[in-house]
Amino acid sequence: MSDRLFIFDTTLRDGEQVPGCQLNTVEKIQVAKALETLGVDIIEAGFPVSSPGDFESVVEISKAVTWPTICALTRAVENDIKVAAEALRYAKHKRIHTGIGTSDYHIKYKFNSTREEIVERAVAAVKYAKKFVEDVQFYAEDAGRTDNEYLARVVEAVIKAGATVINIPDTTGYCLPDEFGQKILYLKEHVSGIDNVTIATHCHNDLGMATANTMAGIQNG
């Protein structure tokens, strides 16, 4: 287990997906300042390409807070990444969070693609993001349902491409704590270069296991 834990707060991005919880820019700035006061390390401020409002919020939050890293979400799409970089232009500490689905369900039914093509798209996205910022976080969407051997292959490839943070999401709230902890441990034991990056978790609460899975990830990472 690492001696240093970082708190990554996604209230202003993923939290807004809760029905009825949309915030305007002024309200988002108030939340961001409160998170800074609490000592949150990274604030995921939004998904800039998704709407003009999200773009504006990331810009204004970047101006309003001082020491937390401001993170912007993207898909593994060049225009997403370019727009995110523009939204982060005023951030003192900036991070682009890019990624792609890695489970066979996503590969086949969402992307109509192959495992090989997904690796290529993941690597290309990280390399493109590195043109704008040094701190690049990669998410393997639906990692909870991705077999560990293939997940390790993707993670190793994006680390070689320059990713500084690896996010392992349980997107569908599928995993039990033992299973999720073992997934993190597998990556620690099988991915070259994993000790040179930060491992992040993003656990959904469909089965009420988000906190337990997060703690299992910490114990094994």
Positions of PLM-derived features:
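Basic/polar N-terminal segments that are highly enriched at the extreme N-terminus
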Residues: M1-S2
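Alpha/beta enzyme core
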Residues: L5-I7, Q17-I43, F55-A64, E78-I199, ...
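Flexible glycine/acidic-rich beta-alpha junction loops that bind and position SAM and/or redox cofactors
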Residues: T10
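Short, ordered coil/turn segments that flank beta-strands lining enzyme active or ligand-binding pockets
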Residues: R13
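Divalent metal-dependent hydrolysis catalytic cores, especially in the metallo-beta-lactamase
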Residues: V40-P48, C71
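Short active-site-proximal "capping" loops at secondary-structure junctions
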Residues: P48-G53, R75-E78
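A glycine-rich helix N-cap at a beta->alpha junction
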Residues: W67-T74
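Active-site-adjacent loop and "lid" segments of alpha/beta metabolic enzymes
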Residues: C203-M209
